[in-house]
Amino acid sequence: MKNVDLVIDLQFGSTGKGLIAGYLAEKNGYDTVINANMPNAGHTYINAEGRKWMHKVLPNGIVSPNLKRVMLGAGSVFSINRLMEEIEMSKDLLHDKVAILIHPMATVLDEEAHKKAEVGIATSIGSTGQGSMAAMVEKLQRDPTNNTIVARDVAQYDGRIAQYVCTVEEWDMALMASERILAEGAQGFSLSLNQEFYPYCTSRDCTPARFLADMGIPLPMLNKVIGTARCHPIRVGGTSGGHYPDQEELTWEQLGQVPELTTVTKKVRRVFSFSFIQMQKAMWTCQPDEVFLNFCNYLSPMGWQDIVHQIEVAAQSRYCDAEVKYLGFGPTFNDVELREDVM
């Protein structure tokens, strides 16, 4: 059954994945929402009434009116404290009829130890330094005496997550029982470990194939990929690496905009001109069906319409049939427009 819609970032992150995930969840009424987040990324959604969610653990799709399951994949790295905070903040949505399932092989973050292990790279490569990489490395070491790294083991002595951690069989059965699934990717394609910006990158690939694997979703279940992009791509502040040869680094003053801050570290973001080359590479690897172009409010109608055209030309040049379907003009549900309504 092809019933999984996957949201994925086509640039360097911070393109509005949280916004479009919340928007689609409210519009389409998915019964299951799933992700494999790490603490190095935050996802924000503001609904039509102005209520705000900033998640580092839970999917933003929990706002779906038909919600039955919230699932955290094996590729997740999460803080138990943060998970509890997010559940408490949305307890009106996560009622008794909603099941929260944590994959037994999800990684549990030791906030103090794992963050401390990343102090050096936080400055040398512009990492957020939240401990994601250190936690993953500890899991990869596969120490049979370590009972503090995967959710299955931690649940044996930490009752806060014991009720949520399932077996692999229960995980698979939950996916099979789902009617419509919204899967939420994190970070951005160009931050992928195996793309060209290594070592100024994240600790995994940010592609559809990787996220489906991290969520335990079989490939035949994929219905469509919704790619997200912004008119002016950003990178985190500091020594966060280079950019594509057809783009230049800009200033927020040049754009006439208040400087944006990163969701997690609150650093001023670096901002760039749009890259056709970046979009070609993302289209080839990610093969989105639909695109959400965000931050159109930073440009005139002629400006963002030109970028819409560039995105679709880039797609066609890489054997991809993607169309720009959604446009973002601000941070809330009310600021998302269907392209057909404004062009």
From Swiss-Prot:
Keyword Magnesium attributed: yes
Binding site for ATP: 14-18, 42-44, 187, 294, 297, 330
Binding site for dGMP: 14, 40, 127-128, 142, 202
Signal peptide start-end: none
Cited InterPro entries: Adenylosuccinate_synth_dom1 (IPR042109), Adenylosuccinate_synthetase (IPR001114), P-loop_NTPase (IPR027417), Phage_PurZ (IPR046383)
Pfam families reported in the protein's UniProt record: Adenylsucc_synt
Keywords: ATP-binding, Ligase, Magnesium, Metal-binding, Nucleotide-binding, Purine biosynthesis
SUPFAM superfamilies in alphabetical order: P-loop containing nucleoside triphosphate hydrolases
Keyword ATP-binding: yes
Active site: 14
Cofactor(s) it depends on: Mg(2+)
One MF term in the entry's GO annotations: ATP binding
EC top class named in words: ligase
Coiled coil feature spans: none
Its biological purpose: Involved in the synthesis of the atypical nucleotide dZTP (2-amino-2'-deoxyadenosine-5'-triphosphate). Catalyzes the condensation of aspartate with deoxyguanylate into dSMP (N6-succino-2-amino-2'-deoxyadenylate), which undergoes defumarylation and phosphorylation respectively by host PurB and guanylate/nucleoside diphosphate kinases to give dZTP. dZTP is integrated into the viral genome instead of adenine by the viral DNA polymerase. This Z-base probably completely replaces adenosine and forms a triple bond to the opposite T-base. The resulting non-standard viral DNA is called Z-genome.
The protein's name in its UniProt record: N6-succino-2-amino-2'-deoxyadenylate synthase
